[in-house]
Design a protein with these regions (language model features):
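Fe(II)/2-oxoglutarate oxygenase catalytic core
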Residues: 1-160, 168-216
Length: 216
C-alpha cells in the first residue's frame, strides 16, 4: 500500500484492495443483481445507484474494506482529533464500545454520466468520514474533483479515497467520457452519536433538501 496525502484530510490509500478481491466482489454483484435505486438518478446525480445491504455476503465484503480503511485513516491521521481514545474506537463491538455504521452503496457511471458538486451527508445520522473505493480504472474521465482545494483525483483500481464529511470537502464526479466507472461508497458514523429525529423535532425530517446533496 502507498499512502498519498494530498492535504491534511484528503488521502488516497493506493493498492489497498487487491485486484482479485475486487473481481470477486464484482462477480458477487453480478450474481445477486441488486435492484437499482431509480429515484436517485436526476440531472445532478447521473449514475446508477445500488444499495447492497440486502445481500449479506456482498455487504460483509464491502464492510471488510471500509472498516479497514476507516481504522487506518482515523488512527494514522494526526489531524483527526480522537487522540485520547482512538484504540477504543476500534475495539470489538459490544454495547460498551464504539461501533462504526453506515451503508454500502455501489455506483455505476455510464458514458456521459457525472455527479455534480455536492457534500456527502445522511438525513438522520451524523456521518464523519467518506470513503470512495475505485473498483476499476479502465475508463476515460470520471475523476473526483474537490472544489475548495482545487484538487483532482484520478481513479485507480483498488484505491480508497478518504476525506471528512463536512461543508468544506465539496466535490464532484467528473463526466465519464468513455467506458464505465464503478465505485463502492460509504460515509460512516458512530452509533453513540446517532441522530434520530423524534418529536417535537419530527418536522425536521420534512425540511426540503438540496438535490445536490448526497443522501442515503
Amino acid at each position: 500500500m502507498n499512502v498519498v496525502k494530498h492535504t491534511k484530510y484528503i488521502w488516497e490509500l493506493e493498492d489497498f484492495i487487491s485486484e482479485g478481491e475486487i473481481e470477486y466482489l464484482l462477480g458477487m454483484f453480478n450474481f445477486y443483481n441488486p435492484t437499482i435505486v431509480e429515484s436517485f438518478r436526476n440531472k445532478d446525480r447521473e449514475n446508477d445507484t445500488y444499495i447492497i445491504t440486502d445481500h449479506p455476503d456482498l455487504d460483509a465484503m464491502a464492510w471488510k474494506w471500509v472498516n479497514a480503511a476507516n481504522e487506518y485513516y482515523v488512527k494514522e491521521n494526526q489531524f483527526i482529533f480522537y487522540n485520547w481514545q482512538k484504540d477504543l474506537m476500534f475495539a470489538p463491538s459490544d454495547s460498551n464500545t464504539t461501533t462504526w455504521r453506515g451503508q454500502n452503496i455501489i455506483r455505476m457511471y455510464n458514458e456521459s454520466d457525472s455527479y455534480e458538486w455536492h457534500g456527502d451527508q445522511s438525513p438522520t445520522n451524523h456521518a464523519e468520514f467518506s470513503y470512495i473505493i475505485y473498483l476499476n480504472d479502465d475508463f476515460d474521465g470520471g475523476a473526483t474533483r474537490f472544489m475548495n482545494d482545487k484538487l483532482t483525483i484520478t481513479p485507480k483500481k483498488g484505491t480508497v479515497l478518504c476525506f471528512p464529511v463536512d461543508h468544506y470537502h465539496i466535490h464532484k464526479g467528473v463526466k465519464v467520457s468513455g467506458g464505465h466507472k464503478k465505485i463502492l461508497w460509504n460515509c460512516v458514523y458512530r452509533h453513540e452519536i446517532e441522530m434520530i429525529a423524534k418529536q417535537p423535532y419530527l418536522t425536521a425530517t420534512n425540511v426540503p433538501r438540496s438535490s445536490k446533496r448526497c443522501i442515503w
